[in-house]
């Protein structure tokens, strides 16, 4: 169970075998997320449920989000494509969101006019 976890570095689950609940509700991925070759044996992985989707950073190269599990895995991760304003296309699990970890700068206060 990875609910509410924050992966501030690369999250590499490639070739991992999951035999229990695998939940990523409200999990934040600041960098790469790699599930290539992962094997989900009994229970489908959950990345989103109602308002509790995982978050993926738009500052990461879209190619570094990999959700293609092992071809022999009985369960998989259902992806969707999301296009951002600059035209980049991200493939992330259905129901998840992209976010920008660098907040916009606060507006400067206006100089008083005389």
Region locations from a protein language model:
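N-terminal leader/targeting and pre-domain segments
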Residues: 1-114
């Amino acid at each position: 169970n990875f609910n509410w976890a924050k992966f501030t570095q690369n999250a590499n689950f490639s070739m991992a075998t999951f035999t229990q609940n695998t939940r990523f509700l409200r999990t934040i991925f600041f960098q790469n997320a790699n599930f290539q070759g992962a094997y989900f044996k009994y229970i489908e992985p959950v990345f989103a449920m109602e308002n509790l989707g995982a978050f993926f950073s738009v500052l990461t190269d879209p190619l570094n989000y990999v959700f293609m599990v092992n071809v022999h895995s009985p369960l998989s991760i259902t992806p969707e494509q999301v296009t951002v304003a600059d035209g980049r296309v991200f493939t992330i699990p259905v129901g998840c969101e992209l976010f920008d970890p660098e907040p916009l700068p606060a507006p400067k206060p206006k100089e008083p006019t005389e």
